[in-house]
Design a protein with these regions (language model features):
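N-terminal maturation segment of proteins
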Residues: 1-223
Length: 223
């Protein structure tokens, strides 16, 4: 059922670009940002993550998207909001503008991947979708813009989101799998089966998630 909403690989870059632009428009209507702020999109492969925001400084961020991972429709806005507007890019841009430049707190020019700021940064980025879109606005935008761009049918979109809301309640199964896989000696194949059974993930998604868990370890609790 879920896989009918996978964005075709040759459409991913276009729909992510559109999503980031819409998230930017909505964010700038409420948050003042430097005139020169901008993001650029880089499509890549061979990574353990789906999306990654690399702040370059001077109010610019490169948003990397991993082509290897299937992108379902809900991830399009999620990636645009989480990685860019009003998520990681906006957070880093405001930290640079308010703390580094205005106050001279140069230590904030360094953004550690693992550190005390991670919980705040990821929590704020996760909340980005809800700041930018109401549930009704999100569905309307996906049905009228994203799905047509991707060549997908939106007839069952509401049903899909009811399913996805239930799926989201299984999120903490990932932390349990991470705990057993990293520290309890759980074999990789068993961990994949757990994610499939208790997290209702496909084998491909479960395998990619384990790669992320292995690389990022306890960082995964930030999500």
């Amino acid at each position: 059922f879920r896989d009918q909403f996978i964005i075709p690989a040759d459409k991913v870059e276009a729909v992510i670009t559109e999503s980031v632009a819409e998230c930017r428009r909505r964010t700038r209507a409420h948050i003042s940002l430097p005139d020169n702020e901008a993001t650029s999109l880089n499509m890549t492969t061979g990574k353990h993550w789906v999306g990654f925001a690399e702040f370059q400084g001077d109010s610019h961020t490169t948003v990397h998207i991993n082509r290897d991972v299937p992108i379902h429709v809900e991830r399009v806005i999620q990636l645009g909001c989480h990685e860019a507007y009003p998520g990681h890019h906006v957070h880093a841009t405001l930290v640079e503008a308010e703390l580094v430049r205005k106050r001279g707190w140069i230590e904030y020019a360094y953004i550690p991947l693992h550190g005390s700021q991670a919980v705040i940064a990821e929590g704020a980025a996760n909340y980005g979708v809800d700041l930018a879109f109401t549930p009704a606005e999100r569905i309307a935008y996906e049905r009228s813009v994203i799905l047509p761009m991707a060549g997908l049918d939106g007839e069952q979109l509401e049903l899909y989101y009811r399913y996805f809301a239930l799926l989201d309640q299984l999120n903490f199964a990932r932390n349990e799998v991470a705990r057993y896989y990293l520290y309890g000696g759980m074999p990789r194949e068993q961990a994949i089966e757990w994610l499939m059974e208790f997290g209702l993930e496909s084998r491909g998604t479960a395998s990619q998630r384990l790669d992320f868990i292995a690389a990022m370890r306890s960082y995964v609790i930030n999500y």
